[in-house]
């Protein structure tokens, strides 16, 4: 009885995952290859992947293609070119959090640089990445050597940007004055640390 329920559960899960392939047009697109992903890295090529920003039904196709692209090019670099592609491949992943999860991306982004491949991950906020990749999000961010922040209001991102900038040392002067029969003045000087930019300043 238990085995039967398990098998039924597996079939239901499989059916749900494969449901988009009930669409004839999608089956046709996936039935043959005309993109020549294996040629990218051999010659200068521009490949645009455009998806709906309101309907996520086919996002898995984009994620699957990008996963295959990274793995294919890494293998090609090692097998045919001694480790590095002859033409640099740059992936500009706008709305990265909306294309679906790329399997093993935390490991891919750590290795593609040496193969002459780079990826620019564009997000609305860092919380998007953490929602998609959970514990692997920090690994992905750690393998990005440049961060460009164009502003935003999401508190977690603002805090992380402020911490990333670090602190500066400032000179702090405190003065005191005592008013009585004999006036006295005091001056206290010390160095202290201050966030280079606070969350409010970044926003």
What is each stretch, according to the model?
Residues 30-33, 92, 122, 190, ...:
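Preference for short coil/turn "hinge" residues that link or interrupt alpha-helices
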Residues 118-124:
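Structural recognition of the conserved hydrophobic beta-strand(s) that form the central parallel beta-sheet
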Residues 44-47, 107-110, 128-203:
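P-loop NTPase motor core of the ASCE superfamily
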Residues 52, 123, 152:
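Conserved residues at beta->alpha junctions
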């Amino acid at each position: 009885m238990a085995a039967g329920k398990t098998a039924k559960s597996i079939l239901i899960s499989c059916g749900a995952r494969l449901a988009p392939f009930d669409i004839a047009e999608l089956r046709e697109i996936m039935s043959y290859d005309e993109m020549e992903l294996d040629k990218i890295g051999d010659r200068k090529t521009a490949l645009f992947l455009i998806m709906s920003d309101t309907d996520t039904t086919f996002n898995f196709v984009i994620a699957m293609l990008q996963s295959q692209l990274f793995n294919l090019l890494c293998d090609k670099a090692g097998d045919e070119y001694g480790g590095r592609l002859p033409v640099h491949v740059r992936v500009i992943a706008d709305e990265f959090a909306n294309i679906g999860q790329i399997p093993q991306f935390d490991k891919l982004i750590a290795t593609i640089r040496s193969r002459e491949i780079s990826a620019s991950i564009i997000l609305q906020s860092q919380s998007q990445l953490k929602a998609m990749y959970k514990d692997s999000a920090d690994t992905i961010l750690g393998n990005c050597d440049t961060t460009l922040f164009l502003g935003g209001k999401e508190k977690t991102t603002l805090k992380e940007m402020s911490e990333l900038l670090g602190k500066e040392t400032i000179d702090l002067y405190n003065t005191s004055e005592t008013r009585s029969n004999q006036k006295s003045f005091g001056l206290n000087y010390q160095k202290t640390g201050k966030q280079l930019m606070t969350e409010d300043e970044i926003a």
